[in-house]
Amino acid sequence: DNWWPKPPHQGPRPPRPRPKP
């Protein structure tokens, strides 16, 4: 399933840290 050009992968995105009060 690589018949369509995909953007370069930069690895898995880390979860956004929740802002602590």
Swiss-Prot record:
Annotated consequence of substituting residue 6 to A: Severe effect on binding to nAChR from T.californica
Reported impact of residue 16 to A: Moderate effect on binding to nAChR from T.californica
Variant or mutagenesis effect after changing residue 17 to A: No effect on binding to nAChR from T.californica
Region of interest (Implicated in receptor binding), residue spans: 3-6, 8-11, 13-14
UniProt keyword list: Acetylcholine receptor inhibiting toxin, Ion channel impairing toxin, Neurotoxin, Postsynaptic neurotoxin, Secreted, Toxin
Tissue distribution of the protein: Expressed by the venom gland.
Spans annotated as Disordered: 1-21
Annotated localization: Secreted
Variant or mutagenesis effect after changing residue 18 to A: No effect on binding to nAChR from T.californica
A GO cellular component annotation in the UniProt record: extracellular region
Consequence the record notes for mutating residue 21 to A: No effect on binding to nAChR from T.californica
Bias (Pro residues) ranges: 1-14
Keyword Secreted annotated: yes
Result of changing residue 7 to A: No effect on binding to nAChR from T.californica
GO molecular function term, any single one: ion channel regulator activity
Primary localization: secreted
Biological role: In vitro, reversibly blocks human muscle-type nicotinic acetylcholine receptors (nAChR) alpha-1-beta-1-epsilon-delta/CHRNA1-CHRNB1-CHRNE-CHRND (EC(50)=0.44 uM) and alpha-1-beta-1-gamma-delta/CHRNA1-CHRNB1-CHRNG-CHRND (EC(50)=1.56 uM). Binds to nAChR from T.californica (IC(50)=0.03-0.18 uM), human neuronal nAChR alpha-7/CHRNA7 (IC(50)=22 uM) and acetylcholine-binding proteins (AChBP) from L.stagnalis (IC(50)=63 uM) and A.californica (IC(50)=230 uM).
Assembly description: Monomer.
Other comment: Negative results: has no effect on GABA(A) receptors alpha-1-beta-3-gamma-2/GABRA1-GABRB3-GABRG2 and alpha-2-beta-3-gamma-2/GABRA2-GABRB3-GABRG2 or on receptors HTR3A and HTR3A-HTR3B.
Protein name (Swiss-Prot/TrEMBL): Azemiopsin
Organism: Azemiops feae (Fea's viper)
